[in-house]
A protein has these predicted regions:
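Intracellular juxtamembrane helix-capping segments at the cytosolic ends
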Residues: 127-140, 406-420
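Cytoplasmic membrane-interface "Motif A"-like loop-to-helix N-cap segments
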Residues: 72-89, 345-356
Length: 492
């Protein structure tokens, strides 16, 4: 007989997800600065998306493994917390080494070292992310699930705001240099990664210490599992062929809701990947009016010197991308506060689809905001001089933020109710395929589209992202949320 899972207080739910703030802090630093770092280390626009492929590939490999392993693990730290802590420690190592890639030039080319550290960071973030998702599903009862994932989304966006804006603050408030010659990384970016590593480790330790996972017998009672379906079942290790067969059987038999959400996820994450990779060159070209030739390493190498105005414009644009990313995270954090109530009132599908549509239209509107007029902007903590078009780009960040909040919460809230309790971890891991696969497709195609179709004019690839997200919005209406019978059949 299934026992009623106890309700959690607000602060208990907060503690379960608090580590997400630090993980997203690091993730935001990566999203806003990796293209900038790799460009400074010598990557061209076409190859940028290829370097970024390590992120979804790591997710594709790591999350299903970690999901399955955490379902079968129980030690003195619990089921999910050992993986969260280990991932955080590895991520900290990557965050310290990435901005120092030029130091290792005697052993590896800076771009190669940078790519390896991006791979380490992404693998580590994925080791943290998947168990955090499953931890919320484990600890938060169904009646509080919308609240649980909304708090998670709020914390993610708080971390993203601080992480995104940090290099800008270090430059314009503290006074660190934000420019770099080819083959170097700006000091403001280096120190931002050091601070991010510290925050990540601290918040994860808070969750590990302040959250007590249910004992196996309690978990089984709350999830309605029988002795034949233990949550911590430790079967003998099967041969590789058998494990692959079992994996593909799980994929084939995954709940219908999960398959339908995969379509929405494809078009959503295809768009997000483009934004993370190409916002920096798009803003630099479109708003700061830097010619696309200054993103060609061969041209730069052949030039007698890079004009100081180009170096300064690239640094300023890179910092402003952090402001834009922080802005959409602020709007996402605000929207996430109301997300659960809106979903309860209007339905998850309506809120999800509307949010994606706003995001898609916002991407497309990037074309409308070019204005080279230089103005002084008071940001309370400092005053900067930027093109008016840069300030106007804060408008579409509202829609991007709303879409981001929905993407972080809605599919998981819809999915959690469709998964059998004894397979939550592995299915959450498999669901990451719907995050990783579209990013891989985007990484393989976006660079070619940008160079072959748009002649390296990066603003148009942002429009492609908008069209993709609009298709995702339409796809939401074809998702059927799971019913009780389907869940029981999947649980076996």
């Amino acid at each position: 007989m299934q026992a009623t899972q106890p309700r959690l207080s607000f602060w208990q739910i907060w503690n379960v997800s608090f580590g997400f703030l630090g993980v997203q802090f690091g993730f935001a630093l990566q999203n806003a600065n990796v293209s900038r770092i790799l460009s400074d280390l010598g990557a061209d626009l076409h190859s940028l998306s290829l370097f970024w492929l390590v992120a979804p590939i790591m997710g594709l490999i790591v999350q299903p493994i970690v999901g399955s392993a955490s379902d079968r693990t129980w030690n003195r730290l619990g089921r999910r917390r050992p993986f969260i802590l280990a991932g955080a420690i590895a991520a900290v190592l990557g965050m310290i080494l990435l901005p120092n890639a030029p130091i290792f030039v005697a052993f590896l080319a800076p771009m190669v070292m940078g790519a390896l550290m991006v791979a380490l960071m992404d693998a580590s973030f994925n080791v943290c992310f998947q168990p955090f998702r499953s931890l919320v599903s484990d600890m938060v009862p169904p009646s509080q699930r919308n609240v649980g994932y909304s708090i998670q989304s709020l914390l993610i966006n708080i971390g993203a705001v601080i992480g995104s804006i940090l290099p800008f603050v270090l430059t314009n408030v503290i006074g660190l240099e934000n420019t770099a010659q080819m083959g170097e990384v700006a000091p403001s970016v280096v120190w931002a990664f050091y601070i991010g590593a510290t925050v990540l480790l601290g918040t994860v330790i808070w969750t590990v210490v302040r959250t007590k996972e249910y004992a196996p017998d309690e978990y089984n009672r709350y999830k309605g599992l029988t002795e034949e379906q233990p949550a911590t079942e430790k079967a003998p290790k099967a041969p590789l062929g058998q494990r692959l067969s079992e994996f593909f059987t799980l994929v084939k038999d995954m709940p219908k809701t999960m398959k339908q959400l995969a379509v929405v996820q494809f078009f959503s994450w295809f768009a997000l990947f483009i934004m993370w990779v190409y916002t920096t060159p798009a803003i630099t070209q479109h708003i700061w009016n830097v010619d696309k030739q200054w993103f060609d390493p061969a041209y730069i190498a052949a030039a007698p010197m890079v004009p100081e105005t180009i170096i300064m414009a690239k640094g300023a644009a890179g910092d402003w991308v952090g402001i834009l990313f922080a802005a959409y995270s602020v709007f996402a954090a605000i929207f996430s506060i109301f997300l659960a109530k809106l979903a309860d009132k209007f339905g998850r599908k309506t809120v999800y689809a509307s949010s994606l549509a706003l995001g898609g239209l916002s991407y497309v509107s990037f074309l409308l905001f070019q204005d080279l007029t230089m103005i002084n902007v008071n940001l309370l903590i400092t005053e900067v001089t930027v093109p008016l078009g840069a300030v106007k780009l804060l408008i579409p960040m509202v829609g991007v933020g709303i879409a981001w909040a929905a993407i972080l919460a809605m599919p998981y809230a819809m999915l959690a109710g469709a998964l059998p309790a004894n397979k939550t971890g592995v299915y959450m891991g498999i669901f990451n395929f719907t995050v990783a696969a579209p990013q891989i497709v985007s990484g393989l195609t976006a660079g070619w589209i940008l160079s072959s179709v748009f002649d390296n004019d990066a603003k148009y690839i942002i429009v492609v992202a908008g069209v993709s997200m609009l298709i995702g919005a339409v796809s939401v209406f074809f998702v059927n949320e799971a019913d009780k019978q389907e869940i029981e059949e999947a649980q076996g």
